[in-house]
Amino acid sequence: MSKKYCYLFTEGNANMRELLGGKGANLAEMTNIGLPVPQGFTITTEACTQYYADGRQINDEITADIFEHVKGLEKITGKTFGDNENPLLVSVRSGARQSMPGMMDTILNLGLNDEAVEGLAKKTNNARFAYDCYRRFVQMFADVVMMVPKSLFEVEIDKMKEADRKSTRLNSSHNRESRMPSSA
């Protein structure tokens, strides 16, 4: 039998901190006591250890377990990851065995793209919300994965707000324009 690298929140508990990390164990415990926690799963600390043992490569066994759990989330939520009409959005949060406040990065709204954001806007009947989610995803991904400074996005957003002094809130057209910073 292959090793289990992912656990649904419903499968874990607070005593599994070494395996699930602090956040994973706490999310599992909150789920177990009935608090309203979005459906999700935790990739184990053993998967991280294996990743480093494999030369910073995610092996096929870990990949298969992750895909299996994404499919499980799709079944539970009725949404589909990467779907343009009813997208499943996930948050990626790192969590160590020991608490390290401010040291770990987060990416929200993974699953959005240029087409899926339109589906989210239609599904929620709220284009501003959908494009704000997408902007946040692109900004976090650019910062965490691509190491693009947050300040580049903030400068562009401030320029848009200045050009449209009617509101300090970004509307959906601003968010469409702010997906990527200009190269200027």
Functional labels for PLM-detected ranges:
Residues 1-169, 176:
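N-terminal beta-alpha lobe that positions the nucleotide/phosphoryl donor
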